[in-house]
């Protein structure tokens, strides 16, 4: 499960996206918070998210008195990074759109780019949706300190906004793909 609030610990499982050239790799990360508020993370890779959260902790360690607070900080940093990824995909979509509307010949490579962007956008959206589920589960939990809940509500708004942006990019890609296929069809009809 993505989130489990058991008697002796809270467990949360997430996927973190890591850009690899024009696509992403998905790396699983698990968090466990004991009843004493100790946070343990289990991961196979190093992430910018953890380095950034560590910097925040070092600058203001009093604000991170429990593993609950540290987990929320990690999720905040990750949501910021997810926003960067959504923005990056949006720029790639805009570049493909510009390429198609430039009037240059549309070939299979353009269609492959569109397809790859659709896949990346869909995976990114699913990943952000998973984050939304975890945040909603934490919001329903009664075990987190009360001072965390206002931050959670803001984080959920941010995640909802990211989902909307990812949806827009996906819809735009559908439109771009339709336009590209239409232009290819026109080119083929002119040849005939």
Model region roles, listed by residue range:
Residues 1-62, 87, 92, 130, ...:
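Helix-boundary and N-terminal cytosolic regulatory elements
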